[in-house]
Design a protein with these regions (language model features):
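Amphipathic, Lys/Arg-enriched alpha-helical "gate/interface" segment within cytosolic domains
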Residues: 1-147
Length: 147
C-alpha cells in the first residue's frame, strides 16, 4: 500500500470550501482529500458553491494525482461547484502549479482565477455573488497558522 504524500486542511466558509494544500500531492493524498472535501461540501450540494484553494510549498501534483484531481473536480460541477480561486502567495513553484491547475480545470465548466492573497480570492468570489463567511475564513487562517 502506498501512503499519502501531501497534506491539507479543509473548512467550509459559507458558500465556499476553503482548502490549504501542502504539497506535493500523490494520488493517495488526492483520494483522502476528496473524502474530506466531500464531507465539507455536502451541505452545499444542489446550489452553486465555490472553492478557495491556498497552496503552500512545492504545490505540485504527480501526473496520476493531477488526473485524479481533474476527475474529482469534474464530478463536483454537476453538484454545484462553479468557481475556483487559487491563492499562490505561499507556493514555491507558482508557474508549474499554475500550469498544472489550468490543465486540471480547463474544460470543466468551472470558472477559475489565480490570485496572491486569500482576500483577493474572497473579493473575486463575492463579486460573483457568493456568500463567504469571513469569521470562518479567519478561523481557517488561524488553524493554518497553528500548523
Amino acid at each position: 500500500m502506498r501512503y499519502a504524500h501531501g497534506e491539507f486542511i479543509v473548512t467550509r466558509c459559507g458558500d465556499a470550501v476553503v482548502t490549504q494544500a501542502y504539497g506535493p500531492w500523490n494520488k493517495e493524498c488526492v483520494k483522502s482529500f476528496a473524502n474530506e472535501y466531500r464531507f465539507n461540501a455536502e451541505a452545499l450540494f444542489g446550489k452553486e458553491w465555490c472553492n478557495i484553494v491556498c497552496v503552500t510549498g512545492e504545490s505540485l501534483l504527480i501526473p496520476d494525482a493531477e488526473l485524479q484531481l481533474r476527475e474529482r473536480t469534474a464530478a463536483m460541477h454537476p453538484l454545484g461547484l462553479t468557481h475556483i480561486a487559487v491563492v499562490l502567495s505561499d507556493s514555491t513553484a507558482k508557474a508549474t502549479t499554475k500550469a498544472q491547475l489550468k490543465r486540471t480545470y480547463k474544460g470543466l465548466n468551472v470558472e477559475f482565477t489565480f490570485v496572491e492573497l486569500i482576500e483577493n480570492a474572497v473579493e473575486w468570489l463575492v463579486g460573483h455573488g457568493f456568500n463567504i463567511d469571513l469569521e470562518s475564513i479567519s478561523l481557517h487562517v488561524a488553524k493554518v497558522a497553528s500548523k
